[in-house]
Amino acid sequence: LKEYADIVQTNSNLLLQLISDVLDISRLESGKLQFNYEWCELVNHCQNMITLTNRNKTVDVDIKLQMPKEPYMLYTDPLRLQQIIINLLNNALKFTPAGGSITLDYEVDEEKQCMLFSVTDTGTGIPEDKQELVFQRFEKLNEFVQGTGLGLAICKLTIQYMGGDIWIDKSYKNGARFIFSHPIKKQESTEK
């Protein structure tokens, strides 16, 4: 009986996630998704995301923030940034076997005036012919892995709405590396 209850619970959670994902895409496309920008300290914010992901993992995978990092204030929507990064971390977790690692990193690209975030794993990787498909709705690389196939589409739309872009690092061959850009703004420029 417990086994059936667990199956019902799992399927209920998947259905709720699917509904939530479809609503997010609908809000993004109609311009009705709310963005609340504020100054956010990245080291603590990223470390909190790592802690959250570590708490929910079911496989022994090392998830870490690339260190050392200097404190950095980014003008962003902290909730949307968290949604993007946790989605990327959770995807990496799905495809990284026990004993593997996942690294969250970020660096300023002064020339392009953006922050570059990356999530790198030592998982199964993504075949080259599938790399552009992963950002399409309902696209799943593996039908046996849980998920709606909407997470990366939501990430891409959200990142584009915030003025950035997302892509797969084709040069990385030891798993998968997703990189996304986020515009930066100087703190002084917003003070009056």
Language model features with spans:
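Short conserved segment of the HATPase_c
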Residues: I126-F138
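A conserved beta-strand-to-alpha-helix junction within the catalytic ATP-binding
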Residues: N36-T51, Q82
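Short alpha-helical Gxxx[C/S/T] motif in the catalytic ATP-binding
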Residues: G151, C155
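Short conserved segments within the C-terminal catalytic ATPase subdomain
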Residues: N56-L65
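Short alpha-helical segment of the dimerization/phosphotransfer core of two-component systems
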Residues: T10-L15
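Helix-loop junction within the histidine kinase core
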Residues: S26-Y37
